[in-house]
């Protein structure tokens, strides 16, 4: 959902990902942060030309089901969240304002009962951004891939910043998720991290799932993305009434 342009091209006779218009956060991540984050697989940086990154191509996509079954999904996210590394560059600042909420709700046109529920959660949402752990900020299934050797890799780092681990777990919950699905994700994650209790993670996961609706709605409509209407219709069908 970012503003960069991505394509495959040859570099020294081998296919790579050329990402032009990469954000400063993502450029700095690959140049300065990635090497310090042990236990986390990210694409190798092959070359940099200004705001254009040439990255290792990760050839095999993964499904959400595959991510759930792969212990490395949760182990790698936990490694990131527990990292002692402190970036020496400006990272993405995440937040959830009432203005952003009202903007998204005006677009979504949900029943007033749903609007009130979302506004109530927004008032508590500051908890998501009080955490001092590093997060991807965009760990949806489309940003994972598998190398030929079977290694799981997480890419697309323009939202690299600080926040609750639940922000990275929320995209792993199918659709809007049931309580059992939330608890299953938390159980897998807690095998690798004790940063937050299960109860705290569940609370944050509900908040993060709601926050992502606001974030995605506003990003897609502000950037006039062609898939915006598809997402909006899906949200209207899925959100409680």
Show where each model-derived region lies.
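Glycine-rich, phosphate-binding/catalytic loops in enzymes
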Residues: 71, 153, 170-173
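Conserved kinase catalytic-core helix
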Residues: 61-96, 111-119, 125-127
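Active-site activation/catalytic loop segments of kinase-like enzymes and analogous catalytic loops
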Residues: 166-195, 209-236
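Regulatory N- and C-terminal appendages and interdomain linkers associated
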Residues: 25-26, 235-241
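Active-site acidic catalytic loop and adjacent metal/ATP-binding pocket
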Residues: 5-10, 122-167
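Short Pro/Gly-enriched beta-strand edge/turn motifs at strand-loop
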Residues: 26-29, 37-39, 117-129
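A conserved alpha-helical element in kinase catalytic cores
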Residues: 3, 13-54, 61-82
């Amino acid at each position: 959902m970012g503003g960069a342009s991505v394509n495959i091209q040859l570099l020294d006779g081998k296919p790579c990902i050329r990402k032009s218009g990469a954000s400063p956060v993502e450029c700095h991540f690959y140049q300065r942060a990635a090497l310090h984050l042990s236990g986390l697989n990210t694409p190798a940086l092959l070359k940099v030309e200004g705001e254009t990154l040439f990255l290792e191509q990760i050839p095999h996509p993964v499904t959400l089901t595959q991510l759930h079954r792969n212990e490395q999904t949760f182990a790698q996210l936990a490694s990131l969240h527990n990292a002692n590394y402190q970036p020496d560059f400006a990272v993405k600042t995440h937040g959830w304002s009432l203005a952003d909420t009202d903007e998204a709700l005006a677009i979504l046109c949900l029943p007033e009962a749903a609007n009130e529920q979302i506004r109530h959660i927004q008032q508590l949402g500051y908890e998501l951004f009080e955490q001092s752990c590093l997060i991807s900020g965009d760990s949806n299934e489309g940003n994972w891939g598998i190398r030929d050797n079977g290694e799981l890799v997480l890419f697309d780092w323009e939202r690299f910043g600080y926040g609750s681990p639940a922000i990275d777990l929320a995209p792993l919950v199918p659709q809007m998720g049931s309580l059992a699905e939330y608890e299953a994700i938390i159980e897998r994650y807690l095998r690798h991290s004790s940063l937050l209790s299960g109860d705290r993670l569940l609370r944050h996961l509900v908040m993060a799932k709601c926050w992502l609706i606001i974030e995605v709605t506003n990003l897609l409509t502000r950037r006039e993305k062609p898939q915006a209407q598809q997402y909006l219709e899906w949200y209207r069908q899925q959100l409680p009434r």
